[in-house]
């Protein structure tokens, strides 16, 4: 028998004995190895027995022997590959844990050599990178030799693979795993331009990761709650996983914290003016403002370093603060469907003074109802005009019930605005920030466009805000799936109301009304308590009420519809009380003044005064939409001798009725009777839901309302 045949016989005999007598099988193999020490099959069989018996130490020694003596055997590398895969695996099963323990028994030098050789045999870029990363973590001394090369390979692979998003497996491994190893190892020498390149890549990744829902998941409008027209959009319930990575690897804890740590390390390596200890975003921004003031006094190299310090520090404060603001006012953009439902908020001009700026000469027309009104404190007065505070220091009002952390959210909004202003205050910052935004394609970020729109409205640049809102609508259209007919997305409704508030601020009242009436089609009824007076705001009369000239309102029908009615009232009020006569506008004002009655009583008295001066009044929609008992009594009184016998044409087609009654019952008798009966019927309607009446008014009379403002 040949030597090869002898070896095969001994191995086969040992295999047969394993199930019956393990020790006998091992004795056969020990004898065989003594006789044929250069035979690989004998060594491998011994290793297999020890591995299957899960004897870590013995199996480790045998694996080491095979690695040293038979480095070219494919079976050895297959075995090593299985073990290194277990090292990268998150699984905690028994077999995986055994393989990890087996690897730990090997000498460190052998572990390092194994990992390097396995890496060389990997043809898949991602797998090769993970293996090399395993090496760098276990043997930090290898970072100097392999760290930068691995980082560049990952960035190159990202380019070659033409990844659509910065949030991909290659960038994740580079930013979260490789980059910290490189920049925290002071033996790795990195030029400043390479550090800035890496910081840029990290910032792009983390910001896109935090805000990924905006780009990666389509928004669509689901079934709406009857009490909430503009409820948060529903999204797919599947968890976010980066393609090529496991769910665990895809999850990043405290991404903002990680990003600012990278900023600090890069800053120290680039010799920025750093402060010891952690600084808040507010402190950091304040420091950057100070640095900008005396930056030009440094030499050219330091000057260049500090310019980059201001750029990247301010930029990160801006994106973080803007994100914190938007994620608070519209959390549905970033939260999964299982998160608690939160109503979005929308920034609007405050038109709470719509009932103000009224001076009434009560001596001209006194009635019992108006006498009662004399005792009531006016909600607004004309001197409030002096308190206007437009521009940089405008106030934003938000209810604690709508936003529990309102102080923090408004602070984030302030920091984001100030960061934005600083980034555009110097030519270098403007140029570099614009370049970065173009490279990152920030113009496609829906969440950022929402912030920018609110910022422009805050600044009072309403024409720019209108352009931004059209950009927002186009952007939303490109990201959304086709909508169900008759349903508007949250962003579409947000755009309508913000367009309305901007057109109003510009004095474009017909456009204001048009947007409001379009929005009315989306209102969900019934809205309860909409017609009750809001006593809370008028309990304490602020000295400068109009200084509070912006509001964050919930995107619900209950909150938005009253605001829309305020806008319409403000539009028609200006036309109704001019020197020229406009009964239609005056009639619309009277209908709209029913909301929040008696807050609008002073304005109603001014309307009555104007009717008295005219001696007559025509508004044929009166009995369709006026159900306020005080108003009905006032108009009934106007018909009496004491009220001035004012001629009122409030019934539909009343002119035709007068002609008809001339023949049959005389000119006035029949009309008076019709008016009395109509008034009695109207009194019986006083219990109707006022918001339903006003909603019907907006829907049914849309054409008439717009014609009045033409």
From Swiss-Prot:
Pfam families named in the record: INT10
InterPro entries for this protein: Int_cplx_su10 (IPR026164)
Keywords: Isopeptide bond, Nucleus, Phosphoprotein, Ubl conjugation
GO biological process: one example: RNA polymerase II transcription initiation surveillance
Modified residues annotated as Phosphoserine in this record: 231, 381-382
Keyword Flavoprotein assigned: no
Compartmental location: Nucleus
GO cellular component: INTAC complex; integrator complex; nucleus
Cross-link for Glycyl lysine isopeptide (Lys-Gly) (interchain with G-Cter in SUMO2), residue positions: 464
Function recorded in the entry: Component of the integrator complex, a multiprotein complex that terminates RNA polymerase II (Pol II) transcription in the promoter-proximal region of genes.
Family per similarity comment: Belongs to the Integrator subunit 10 family.
Subunit structure: Component of the Integrator complex, composed of core subunits INTS1, INTS2, INTS3, INTS4, INTS5, INTS6, INTS7, INTS8, INTS9/RC74, INTS10, INTS11/CPSF3L, INTS12, INTS13, INTS14 and INTS15. The core complex associates with protein phosphatase 2A subunits PPP2CA and PPP2R1A, to form the Integrator-PP2A (INTAC) complex. INTS10 is part of the tail subcomplex, composed of INTS10, INTS13, INTS14 and INTS15.
Protein name: Integrator complex subunit 10
Taxon lineage: Eukaryota, Metazoa, Chordata, Craniata, Vertebrata
